[in-house]
Amino acid sequence: MYFPIVALIGRYQDTGLDAPLTALAQMLTQAGRRVLVEAETARNAGVSGYPVADWDEIGRTATLAVVMGGDGTVLGAARHLAPYGVPLIGINHGRLGFITDIPLQDAHDALGRVLEGNYQAEDRMLLQGGVWRGEQQMYSASAVNDVVLNRAGRGGMIEVRVELDGAFMYTQRADGLIIATPTGSTAYSLSANGPILHPGMNAMVLVPVAPQTLSNRPIVIPDSGVLNMTLTAMGRVEIGASVHFDMQTWSDLQPGDRITVQRAPHTIRFVHPEGYSFFSTLRRKLHWNLMPQATDNLE
């Protein structure tokens, strides 16, 4: 039997998930699977009648996690479950949905095919980041999409000295600096004019946000390297800066703080129905197939 124990995870603040999650749980039970419901999902979405489990129990027990929500919901679940090796499948109940690639209306059919063994699996890298103040590590977190250094809301540009494996790259003055995985290359990085990286690539991309010097362009680096970024005390950095991990966890920064980013030791496995294509997702989400049309009311 494929995936005998399935965990259900939903977007916490979405009160409209009760019916679709309950229907999904019933479908899984009828298919002979044991269903677990993540604790916060059960509490906030109102799903009842099934065993409730915390993240640790899901990680130790589940053979598949079904995540219903937007990409942000999947990112949070992935960070929790990656160390356990539990594969994820995403059902889109959000907006764009690059990694929640199954539309809600197709969820039962798609999941049924997956349970029959008709699926594709892919492993994607994560980033591991740390904040150092002198020799003391102040903060550590992982990220599926990106690690982002940002100026404070009313502050000036930040200045960051960037090194890769001890070799000096540049000193960057900008509103921010994005370090993205291939998965994250279609998120914040893309909106800052970063390149799209195929998820099978072993790489990271550095993308400046509104750099002072226009010649400071995105650069792709191997994922085997260790990035060291030091926030300098020049300019108006003292007003405030922070580092964000998938825009869900963060740490405030001070001048002189050092941020390290490298590939995490574990990966996250995504499960897709048979026939999934990364390029098909790009065509749908980015409307690559839409051609400009002539109109009669051109201005």
Curated annotation (Swiss-Prot):
Task: Give EC number(s), comma-separated.
Answer: 2.7.1.23
Q: List the Gene Ontology MF annotations in alphabetical order.
A: ATP binding; metal ion binding; NAD binding; NAD+ kinase activity
Query: Which transformation does this protein catalyse, written as a reaction?
Result: NAD(+) + ATP = ADP + NADP(+) + H(+)
- Enumerate the subcellular locations listed in this protein's record, separating them with semicolons: Cytoplasm
Q: Which residues form the active site?
A: 71 (proton acceptor)
**Among the entry's GO cellular component annotations, what is one?**
cytoplasm
Kindly indicate whether the keyword NADP belongs to this entry: yes
Its needed co-factors are:
a divalent metal cation
A GO biological process held by the record: NAD metabolic process
InterPro entries linked to this entry: ATP-NAD_kinase_N (IPR017438), ATP-NAD_kinase_PpnK-typ_C (IPR017437), NAD/diacylglycerol_kinase_sf (IPR016064), NADK (IPR002504)
Primary enzyme class: transferase
Q: Where does NAD(+) bind?
A: 71-72, 145-146, 173, 175, 186-191, 210, 248
Q: What does this protein do?
A: Involved in the regulation of the intracellular balance of NAD and NADP, and is a key enzyme in the biosynthesis of NADP. Catalyzes specifically the phosphorylation on 2'-hydroxyl of the adenosine moiety of NAD to yield NADP.
* PANTHER family documented for this protein: NAD KINASE (PTHR20275:SF0)
Name the record gives this protein: NAD kinase
Q: Which organism is it from?
A: Bordetella parapertussis (strain 12822 / ATCC BAA-587 / NCTC 13253)
